[in-house]
Amino acid sequence: MLYAVLCYNDESVTSAWSKEEDERVMRDLSAVQRKYVEAGKLGPVARLVPTTAAATLRHSAGETIVMDGPFAETKEQLLGFYLIDCASLDEALDFARDLSNANPSTGSYEVRPLALYKPGELPS
């Protein structure tokens, strides 16, 4: 089954890292990724740019509004995601644990099963 592993963190913490700290964290996370790539389980991985570059489109009262940044007023923001093919939720949680152990910050990892739909096909 495919799972999305969504990476959340306080953007003010991660943006304060020095270049060296950021490179070290990325290197440690890459080591975790390699293990799952070699097992044929890891799909696309993305690191999102800061929320200051984001826009949110919201439909309200018959109007479409575009706002700068994310809509959620929260300390933790979605900073990246992984797609992983695992036999069980427990296996996907093990992957998230490995990521968490490689990342010294206080962020969180949300693991969510995926339902895939092919373009032009409706789910049954």
From Swiss-Prot:
InterPro entries: Dimeric_a/b-barrel (IPR011008), YCII (IPR005545). Pfam families: YCII (PF03795). PANTHER family: BLL7171 PROTEIN, BLL7171 PROTEIN-RELATED. Belongs to the YciI family. This is Uncharacterized protein R00369. It comes from Rhizobium meliloti (strain 1021) (Ensifer meliloti).
